[in-house]
Amino acid sequence: MGRRSANSSGFSLIELLVSLAVGALVIGSAVQIFTRGLNATFVVSQRAQMQQDLRATSDLLFKDLSLAGAGLPSATGILLPSAAGRPIYGFAPSCVAKNNCIPGGGIAYPCTSVAAVPCNPTLYGLIPGWQLGITVPGSPNRSDVVTVVYTDTVFALPCYTIQAITATTVIVQLPAPLPATCILTPPLVAPQAVNAPAVGLTPGDLVLVQSTVGGNSATVIAEVTGVAANGGGNYTVTFAGGDTLNMNQPGAPAASLTQLVCGPAPAAACPATASTTRIFATSYYLWMLPDPLGVGAGTPTLMRQVNGQTPVPVQEGVVNLQFTYDTYGPTGALLNAVGDGGYSTGTSFNLIRKINVVHLTTRSQVSGAKSGLMTTNGYQTFDTQTSISARNLSYQNRYVVAP
């Protein structure tokens, strides 16, 4: 009787199950390693992007803070008009249309002193805004606002001579030859046109007008509402009332262009020393960028507003902005880390000597804690702290260049 040979082709059921289990284990391990690698890459790339964003923000903010008061003629502040209400800064002109304005419509310029009656609004080179900002969701405290003011050294507006000043206009002329006081920033070979598209005056700009009244120097700050070219290097700059920042008040008894009225020559020529200079009043504050889907509270965003121009976002995801200031009290005592810059004690903002950035905090907008690089799930956060010298606030130019 013949012997039947067993069929050895294929796998048994047990062998098939074992091979499937081993294959699933190998593939699962590979997928897990790949997922961990992707998560680690995401965390690292997100962290690098946050660092880059914060570095760019810090460069812009810290440079502005270091320029506080640069080029301003007075170390004691510049008086502003108040007959039609106090001028404002920050959150304008789009405050009403956008949420989280503190207070609604803008922040009024501070008085010369907290106890001054009546209030004389004054522009300083540095204006602290302690707890005048929004409260970011999840934060226990209000954020701060900070405003710095300095002159524009690129736009050669001081090279123009003033031909006439009325209550609402200033007429300037480009002289030939240029006066000795005309300083051009390289590579400029001639002053730019007053209405030049890139650097010229536009509505919302602030102009510092200096002249002489009764033998005494006088300074007025006005907001540009229009610029017209008259030909031959002659321009009419309009400072009409009802401006965004409430700077133009023709009927004010002080600190308005009405007190500087002069020209045209030869009947009532303007002083040869009269000049115009553009200044930058730059405010930083936090604002909640609305959720495009209208679902969440929005994204906390650091905003930057220059003069009366539309505010622009600097960086999204900034959740805290706080400052303190080192200054001197009325008796000369050193006050360290004061939130309001000593304003509540009657101290002038021009006595501030150091700006302390207590918190400039940025947070990731998407959870980045997805790998072993982070101990718990959550958001990545960076907090910047530094101090900046306010060296220009106490500077006074004792040397006047004759025209």
Map each language-model feature to its residues.
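N-terminal secretory signal peptides that target proteins for export/translocation
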Residues: 1-6
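N-terminal single-pass transmembrane signal-anchor helix
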Residues: 7-34, 46
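Short linear sequence signals and composition-biased patches located at protein termini or domain-edge surfaces
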Residues: 8, 39, 45-49, 53-60, ...
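Solvent-exposed, flexible loop/coil residues
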Residues: 15, 42, 54, 176
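Glycine-rich, histidine-containing beta strand-loop boundary motifs that form or position
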Residues: 20, 28, 37, 69, ...
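Autoprocessing Asn-cyclization modules and mimics
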Residues: 119-247
